[in-house]
């Protein structure tokens, strides 16, 4: 069960690279489209961050919660889970072309992509590269999305590839307004993320 929890969240949290975003968006809500575009352009410049927070997972057969540490440096990631989510700790590291999952007292798992590792370990197909965008309050650029803006022209919710993401609150860090509480709902899976500490960075290319 622990491995199931760890793979579920950490693989959703992976990326396929920080490419530029397209215009496959359907906008609605109370925000101003021009302000949204400016906000999106600012957030897309972030290619590094450190996050500390909590994550909860609900699935038909099991559920749990734990602490999250996520270090992102361009295309390199280091994601760690610990606490009641399982009986130990998990660490996921890698970059495009190579992913390593280490689970305390259970083993080490490798794949060429997070999608491949998820498919191999669980047999699930999920948009695992999207959360690197969603966690910043952006839609993933490679598929269509339906966006609802709040009164501050930030995302209140988005629908993309069969997932619904709700943005419950934001926090301001270093001039960036970033999601603080998110709820993600997919087929047979709900994920709640509460960010306690955001440290955004622009590392350059």
Swiss-Prot record:
Q: Where in the cell is it found?
A: Cell outer membrane
Instruction: Cite the CDD domains for this sequence.
Output: LolB
One GO cellular component, as annotated? cell outer membrane
In the UniProt record, does the keyword Protein transport occur? Answer: yes
What domain of life does the native source organism fall in? Bacteria
Q: Would the keyword Transport turn up in this protein's UniProt record?
A: yes
The UniProt entry, under Gene3D superfamilies, shows: Lipoprotein localisation LolA/LolB/LppX (2.50.20.10)
Q: Where is the lipid attached (N-palmitoyl cysteine)?
A: 18
> What is the membrane topology noted in the UniProt record heading this document?
Lipid-anchor
Q: Which GO terms describe its biological process?
A: lipoprotein localization to outer membrane; protein transport
Question: In terms of one coarse class, where is the protein primarily found?
Answer: membrane
Family per record: Belongs to the LolB family.
**Name the record gives this protein:** Outer-membrane lipoprotein LolB
Q: Which organism is it from?
A: Pseudomonas putida (strain ATCC 47054 / DSM 6125 / CFBP 8728 / NCIMB 11950 / KT2440)
